[in-house]
Amino acid sequence: MAGNAVLLKRSSNVPGCALAIEEIFHQAGFPANLFQTLLVSSDKVNLIIENHLVKAVTLTGSTSAGREVAKKAGEMLKKTVLELGGSDPYLILEDAALETAVPSCIKSRIINSGQSCIAAKRFIVVESIRKKFEELFVRQMSAQKMGDPMEENTTIGPLARHDLRDTLHQQVIKSIEKGAKCLLGGEIPESKGAFYLPTVPHRGDKRNASLPGGVIRTSSGNHPGS
């Protein structure tokens, strides 16, 4: 995107982030309107893509949204870059130093309350070390501090919206109904806000969409391909 003006249609959940980026461009002395934030609803996106001044489109988001953007941009033969939803695996092999691996696993999952697109989604553990891994894993997850993300000692904050929290809870329930064992959590706390208790389901339904929040899904096998 170097050398080009940018129009940013940010997630409706966090418009403040986009406005802050725009302000940084302004303070850095870039020409006015070189970077603009569009506070519009998702149903207006096609109008933006169709505009003849827009030469390329990029999206970081869900697979379903990516299909719609690719379809509209493809109709007009516009360049497209898509970074879509996934279920990124984190592999723990039998020679792993668990004292190092477990904190790394947890940090990679609960970053930004699990709502970061680069957060690990699934943790696949070699069966021979599963019990020891789960013991350390659950112990350290249960020690996480849930609360105000502006407080320094908080490690897990709320989800962006209550409906996202409720959807997450339903996904956990469905995993348990399909045979998953909940090693920790699995409940909505009584505290105000869109919080969800740190949760560890084991052997969940692998077909589920990626889970946001402080939910860490584990499974095991005799080799990484299991």
Predicted regions and their residues:
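Glycine-rich phosphate/pyrophosphate-binding beta-alpha loops
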Residues: 111, 215-216
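A local structural motif
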Residues: 31-34, 155, 217-219
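ALDH superfamily catalytic-core signature
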Residues: 29, 56, 64-206, 224
